[in-house]
């Protein structure tokens, strides 16, 4: 189109079909209308099927993940119960061991005390026995020392007779 022509004649419509490319546009629009829906429809259908498949896969993974989460929660609660049971058992066991240790310590202390008392009493009885022995020896020595001065012949004769009678009786 000529610009000088437009400037001189003013605004107008051009109805010449060959100049305006209306036929070309009509062919293109008709082709798009006729062939584009089947071609574009197939592409959109494939894309839609792909999206639906991905959504179904995502939903399946969500279901599996939910099941796995539920199982993990159940396992966790079971493990927590088992841990608390083990903790309670270990507390009971440690308390039992502590009580047993205290009992053994008390028994050992009593045994040591009894041993000390028996050692002390055996020491005391040995000392008493030793003192008695020394007292008897001292008394015998004193008696023997004083005996010659006290014994006269009649007393000595009576003593010998009495000793003989004692021997005969036994």
UniProtKB/Swiss-Prot annotation:
Tell me yes or no: is Repeat among this UniProt entry's keywords: no
Pfam families linked? ATP-synt_B
Query: In what way does this protein cross or attach to the membrane?
Result: Single-pass membrane protein
Instruction: Indicate the principal place this protein occupies in or around the cell.
Output: membrane
Q: Where in the cell is it found?
A: Cellular thylakoid membrane
Query: Does the record's keyword annotation contain Ion transport?
Result: yes
Q: Which UniProt keywords apply?
A: ATP synthesis, CF(0), Hydrogen ion transport, Ion transport, Membrane, Thylakoid, Transmembrane, Transmembrane helix, Transport
Picking any one GO molecular function of the record gives: proton-transporting ATP synthase activity, rotational mechanism
Q: Which family does it belong to?
A: Belongs to the ATPase B chain family.
Subunit details: F-type ATPases have 2 components, F(1) - the catalytic core - and F(0) - the membrane proton channel. F(1) has five subunits: alpha(3), beta(3), gamma(1), delta(1), epsilon(1). F(0) has four main subunits: a(1), b(1), b'(1) and c(10-14). The alpha and beta chains form an alternating ring which encloses part of the gamma chain. F(1) is attached to F(0) by a central stalk formed by the gamma and epsilon chains, while a peripheral stalk is formed by the delta, b and b' chains.
NCBIfam families the UniProt entry points to = PRK07352.1
Q: What is this protein called?
A: ATP synthase subunit b
- Native source organism of the sequence: Prochlorococcus marinus (strain MIT 9312)
């Amino acid at each position: 189109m000529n610009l000088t022509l437009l400037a001189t004649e003013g605004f107008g419509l051009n109805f010449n079909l060959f100049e305006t490319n209306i036929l070309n546009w009509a062919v293109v629009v008709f082709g798009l209308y006729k062939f584009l829906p089947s071609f574009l429809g197939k592409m959109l259908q494939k894309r839609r099927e792909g999206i639906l498949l991905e959504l179904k896969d995502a939903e399946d993974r969500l279901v599996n993940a939910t099941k796995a989460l539920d199982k993990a929660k159940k396992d966790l609660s079971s493990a927590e119960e088992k841990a608390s049971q083990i903790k309670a058992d270990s507390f009971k066991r440690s308390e039992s061991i502590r009580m047993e240790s205290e009992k053994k310590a008390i028994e050992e202390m009593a045994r040591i005390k009894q041993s000390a008392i028996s050692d002390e009493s055996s020491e005391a009885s040995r000392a008493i026995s030793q003192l008695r022995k020394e007292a008897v020896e001292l008394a015998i020595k004193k008696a023997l020392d004083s005996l010659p001065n006290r014994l006269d012949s009649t007393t000595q004769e009576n003593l010998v007779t009495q000793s003989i009678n004692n021997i005969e009786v036994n």
